[in-house]
Amino acid sequence: VGSEMCIRDRLCVPRYLPTTNKTHTLTSLGEMLLPVIEANKGRCFVLCTSYTMMRGLAEYFREKSMLSILVQGETSKGKLLEQFTYTSHSVLVATSSFWEGIDVRGDALSLVIIDKLPFTAPDDPLLKARIEDCKLQGGDPFNDIQIPEAVITLKQGVGRLIRGIRDRGVVIICDNRLVMRNYGETFLKSLPNSSRTRDLNKVIQFLQNQ
C-alpha cells in the first residue's frame, strides 16, 4: 500500500528561491507560488512556519487571485476545514495548528506548500532549556534535538496530502537547505518515496494534466 500511495506524488524544492532574510521575500515567494496554485485550481494547503508569513501570503493571494483564500484564525478550525472541503478552488493558508491532526481526503487537497523547514524558533523558552541541558550532557543540540523535531514536524506537514490510497498530488518545500545542507538528506529520507524536481514549470505541467 505504501508504495502505491507514494509513487504518484511529486516533491519539489524550487530553484531560484528568494533569499530568506530579505524584505522582498514574501512578495517574491507569492509571485513564484501563485501560478502553481492556480494551475491546480486551488485545492491547496499553504503551511507556514510563522504568522507573519501566513498573513502576508494570504494577503498577496487575495490581492492577485480569484481563488477562495481561507486563513487560519478568521474562523474556527473546524469551520475552515469544512469550507475548504466543500468550496471549489480553495486555498487554506495556515500555520502550526494545521501541521497535524488534519484529514482531508481525495480531490479536495492535491497540493501542499511548506514555506520552510519547521525548526522551532531559537528563542522558544522550552527549546532553550532543552538545548542547555543537552550541552551540559555533552550532546550536540542541533543534531540531537532540533533536527529530529523538525523532521517529525515536516513529515506531519507532508502527511496532510498522503492520507489514503487514492490521494495524489504535489508537495513543494520552499527551503534550499533541503538540497544545500548536509542535513537536508536527513529530511528527504524521512519523506515518502516520490519523484523529485526543482523545476516549477514541470510541476505546473503535471498539475494541469491531472
Predicted regions and their residues:
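ASCE RecA-like P-loop NTPase motor cores
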Residues: S3-E4, R8-Q210
